[in-house]
UniProtKB/Swiss-Prot annotation:
Taxonomy of the source species: Bacteria, Bacillati, Bacillota, Clostridia, Lachnospirales
HAMAP family: AroQ
Pathway field: Metabolic intermediate biosynthesis; chorismate biosynthesis; chorismate from D-erythrose 4-phosphate and phosphoenolpyruvate: step 3/7
CDD domains: DHQase_II (cd00466)
UniProt xrefs under Pfam families: DHquinase_II
Name listed for the protein in its UniProt record: 3-dehydroquinate dehydratase
Top-level taxon of the source organism: Bacteria
Assigned protein family: Belongs to the type-II 3-dehydroquinase family.
Positions bound to substrate: 74, 80, 87, 102-103, 112
Length: 147
């Protein structure tokens, strides 16, 4: 079982930016949590982060060629406007995908209430902090096993 966990813009600044929203833990702590969860699930995991839209699209396309079984993605701000990321996710329709957000985007600024990417994902986890990634990983493994 291969899982790709993808993070978009500014996720690498966890523990630095807006601690009241995103918490005190840094990006390395998140990666460590993800790796531990993958071990528990018996899965191989690749964790990827980029502040660049094209790099995220390239990684989604690579997932197809690398026989990735499931994708967990936090597109960051690309969630709200990147039809290019949305189309890349749609192009790998056979791969289960869960969108995750650390904060509850539905209770924040109005522009955050819309996700152009979630309609091409199997589900969404929001507002559960960094643990949301772990729940998303469980869900994507479950979906992949049902394929």
């Amino acid at each position: 079982m291969k899982i790709l966990v993808m993070n978009g813009p500014n996720i690498n600044f966890l523990g630095i930016r807006e601690k009241g929203i995103y918490g005190e833990q840094n990006y390395e702590a998140l990666v460590s949590m993800i790796q531990k969860k993958a071990e528990e699930l018996g899965a191989d995991v690749e964790v990827f982060q980029s502040n660049h839209e094209g790099a995220i699209i390239d990684k989604i396309q690579e997932a197809y060629y690398n026989d990735v079984d499931g994708i967990v993605i936090n597109p960051g701000a690309f969630t709200h406007y990147s039809y290019a990321v949305r189309d890349a996710l749609a192009s790998v329709a056979a791969i289960p995908k869960i969108e995750v957000h650390i904060s509850n985007v539905h209770t924040r600024e109005e522009f955050r209430h819309t996700s152009v990417t979630v309609p091409v994902c199997n589900g969404q986890v929001v507002g559960l902090g960094l643990k949301g990634y772990l729940y998303a990983m469980e869900a994507v493994v479950d979906l992949a096993m049902k394929k």
